[in-house]
Amino acid sequence: MLFRSEFDDIIKQAREFGYRKIAICDHNTVEGHKQFHDEILLTGVEFDCWYGYVFMHLLAYGIDVDNPILNKYMAKKKSGTEMDIIRIFATRNVPQLIDDIHKAGGIAVLAHPACCWALNLDKFVKKLINVGLDGIEVYYPYQRHRKIFKFHTEETVREIADKYDLIKTGGTDCHNRNIL
């Protein structure tokens, strides 16, 4: 979970780079958003999910963090290794999660699609659209995943987003205080 000082650091950097809005999406928790408010911040959370055989991350932007409908997806406590967190908290009901994100006033976006184990990303995205997906993270540091995933590129993901008229988002996928 991000703490107030980390939110402060990230927001300061965002302002220095001239951003008007940013979302800080911690994994499976919105506790930071409940403790910290700023006009530059768009609420968000990154959910660990399984959809079929594919492990993925689903971003929820613009949600009401006080809406109890999303509580069942939130990590109660972050301890142990990241794989323990994934194993314990990853939801397997993505259609219900997307519906609940919408009920909480948000949009559902597939995060860093090059990390998905879907061999046919287009087909996988179409399945997600059929259960309510709103967008896809097109712009993010693909090079972070290059050693493992070589078959999805920014161009491929952008083409899929255009084909299905999805909202295109971008992110840093940072896991520390330095956003750029």
Where are these regions (language model features)?
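His/Asp/Glu-enriched short active-site or ligand-binding loop at hydrolase and phosphoryl-transfer sites
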Residues: 133-145
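Acidic-and-aromatic substrate-binding clefts and catalytic sites of carbohydrate-active enzymes
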Residues: 25-31, 115-120, 144-152
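Extended substrate/RNA-proximal surfaces in nucleic-acid metabolism proteins
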Residues: 30-134
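Short acidic/histidine-rich active-site segments
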Residues: 166-180
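Residue-level marker for buried hydrophobic side chains located in beta-strands
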Residues: 23, 43, 168-170
